[in-house]
């Protein structure tokens, strides 16, 4: 009987295979929360340019390497912290996400819990590393609370994500800190100190918007949150009352913007351009139109998750309004 000889290629060492698997797992985890990371990172990037006069200060910088060092790392710090903390939340919520049929890497088994922990440590470690290289006291004072909020949001014993109002307030504060991190860069700190009303306008409007959006997300998870014993706003107030509250907040948002604009005009320093309240009014109006659709489907989990995804462009438009208002004073 003839013997058939088959050519066998070189065996791939097991450690190389494991490395490929590891890097792939990290990429999967990053991509799973990339959209949220970019949203919060853009809040920081927008903050760099939403202070009137900051472009002139940046343009006066003669050392390009110093300009890059003082601005570029900030959005990346926010990006790393955000994706890391969202994955931490996914890790804690793995059983709930599995029962809710959410297609995320950890509950679906695409990545292991160990790989998720590695991702969390690496992303936050990278953020802290960039922060230490900059050695800017103001940035440190803003980033450390961001990390702390991310931890206690998911930490089992405290778990802000389970607590009535505190969950959404924590998300709003985190988002506001992202914007402040950009506004108080080395080039914007002095301008913010001289015109604090600009800072107040940004954190008030952005805070309300992200607060409303986070509750819209909770509306899609009402059943799962109720079964898990979480006291989210929709669980406590009910869907209809929650939507009424969101509509009131969206109406208040442009009112606050116009009030702050009028205040700055009365004091004759026009810290806020009229472009800002006009833009905020447009965004709030679009959000109210979106709320009419939400009223019809808030009891349907899958439809609500789609509605929350449609909320993301509104965040982007609002960030653009802050920047445009600084660049085009009226």
Tell me the role of every PLM-derived stretch.
Residues 1-330:
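Multi-pass alpha-helical membrane architecture of UbiA-family
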